[in-house]
Amino acid sequence: MSLFDVVIVKPIFNLLMGIYSLIPDFGVSIIIFTVIVRFALWPLAKKQLHQAKAMRKMQPELKKLQAKYKDNKQAQSIAMLDLYKKYNIGPFRSMLVMLIQLPIMIGVYRVVQIFAMHREELGKYTYDLVEKIPTVGNLVQNPDSFNQNFLGIMDLTKHAVSENGITFGILLFALLAALFQYLTSKQTAPNAKSDKRLRDVLAEAEQGKEADQAEVNAIVMGKMTKFMPAFLFFIMISLPGALALYMTVSNGIAYLQNRLVMQQDEDELEDIANSNKQK
């Protein structure tokens, strides 16, 4: 058993087993597990949202700074670092939730593999304490009794698109996961005030006009906002339905959490962004 299995897969496996022992439905267990994960990550996610808010707030100042030092790239870089410090923004801090989510998603995939193709290994991954739960102990002894369906109608070990055809319920989950990813990205994306396309900026650069880095970044972010959901959709249709369900619930909760904070805690975010500016 690899270190990843010990550190990531086994805890996820046993948490799911514990939930399954209470509600013997794989889909419902994944939903409850995802809710637990999202709320455990909520403090980090909220900080990420604060970062996005501060980024938006500093955009006008950043634009002025870039115009001021347009002929001195070294001075511009130093000034930009000072500006990030002023607003207490860490360029990579906003990626923290995503980086934590990635091993969890891989862990869920491994757990689905175990339940779908290696049920004889259930005992190998189950903690002794968890195996003492009667439902779990019976499942370890009788692996074929595992209910891999969601609400009794959808096999979550299947793929949305396979050689056997299309599983429309799982395809719907893949679409919803991509949709919520898009909506969440739009919530935190910097406000774009330019209608220019990347090709327009590149064409201007060829003519000798210096590209506005903030403008380029905004254009690239806009492209990524559209590309990532499409990429996620194609990934989800190639993986077991349990992963599509996990990502749908996870992205859906993230969208609702962001919406709640942006609507009800706008004053709090403004205060935090302003306090970051004063530091």
Model-identified regions with their sequence ranges:
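Helix-loop-helix
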Residues: 1-279
